[in-house]
């Protein structure tokens, strides 16, 4: 779920219907779950999503890359950035990864060495614990006052038999209450058009039980009568997982820019 305001400002001449998204949020529900029941609770301000869009990040990024190319940007698909170039205290670009190496790192007949890609400004948007951003943050000592906490999210996309109209968030079961467990997190269930939903669970990674599995927690949630009713008659299409920064403003570097580079996410 995302606020569409920035996209509308970025693409003022594009009709909202032409920007990839599944639906506009009409209603929302938040539940405190128990093993066999649920209690609806008021949605906190940060979960007020009426008018926001349900989007696929990959589809939106693909569309935005096409818009950028039309404006003259040059994309390097299937190319990773391996190393930051820092020259005389300034970030001057990156070195891309080698191509054409085997599983053991050996050079194949298609081997191509990595190349330097230099720029006046290098924009870092790697997400959690980016290896390039980490080097820059360390080099410029930007993490002296930041506190890092992490969460893990797993999700599934389902084709369902009946449409889901509301954006749903839950907390509580299957996680366990109590200081000794240190378990916190919750789930989402989002409509993706008339016949698909995204369902997922996020768990804070400072839990005490080393055997806790975020994947297993999601599978437990799917056995709840309410969730089971949403998925009944459907089929799972895809599955994925990612880490999420949980420390908010306290996890930001002391500066969002350094000579030759800036952080955007």
Question: What residue ranges belong to the model's regions?
Answer:
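N-terminal FAD cofactor-binding segment of flavoenzymes
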Residues: 1-35, 132
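A glycine- and small-aliphatic-rich helix-loop capping segment at beta-alpha/alpha-beta transitions
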Residues: 5, 138-142, 256
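Redox-cofactor-proximal catalytic regions of oxidoreductases
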Residues: 23-56, 181-182
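Short glycine-rich loop/turn motifs
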Residues: 27, 184-187, 258-260
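Well-ordered beta-strand positions
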Residues: 31, 85, 190-193, 255-256, ...
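Predominantly flavin-linked oxidoreductase catalytic cores and closely associated redox partners
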Residues: 56-232
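Flexible, glycine/charged-enriched surface loops at secondary-structure junctions
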Residues: 229-241
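FAD-binding beta-loop-beta segment adjacent to the flavin cofactor pocket
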Residues: 242-264
């Amino acid at each position: 779920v995302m606020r569409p305001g920035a996209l509308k400002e970025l693409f003022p001449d594009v009709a909202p219907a032409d920007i990839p998204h599944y639906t506009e949020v009409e209603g929302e529900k938040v539940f405190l779950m128990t093993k066999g029941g649920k209690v609806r609770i008021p949605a906190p301000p940060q979960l007020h999503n009426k008018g926001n869009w349900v989007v696929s990040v990959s589809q939106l990024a693909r569309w935005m890359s096409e818009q950028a190319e039309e404006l003259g940007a040059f994309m390097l698909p299937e190319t990773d950035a391996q190393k930051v170039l820092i020259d005389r205290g300034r970030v001057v670009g990156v070195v891309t990864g080698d191509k054409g190496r085997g599983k053991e790192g050996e050079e194949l007949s298609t081997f191509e060495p990595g190349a330097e890609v230099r720029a006046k400004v290098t924009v870092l948007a790697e997400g959690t614990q980016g290896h390039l951003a980490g080097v820059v943050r360390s080099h410029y000592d930007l993490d002296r006052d930041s506190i890092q906490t992490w969460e893990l999210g797993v999700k599934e996309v389902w084709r369902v038999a009946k449409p889901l109209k509301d954006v749903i968030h839950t907390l509580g079961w299957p996680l366990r209450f109590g200081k000794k467990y240190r378990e916190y997190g919750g789930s989402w269930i989002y409509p993706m058009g008339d016949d698909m939903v995204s369902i997922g669970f996020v768990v804070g990674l400072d839990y005490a039980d080393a055997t806790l599995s975020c994947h297993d927690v999601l599978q437990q949630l799917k056995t709840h009568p309410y969730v089971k009713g949403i998925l009944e008659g459907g089929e799972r299409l895809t599955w994925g997982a990612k880490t999420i920064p949980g420390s908010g403003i306290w996890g930001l570097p002391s500066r969002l820019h350094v000579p030759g580079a800036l952080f955007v996410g």
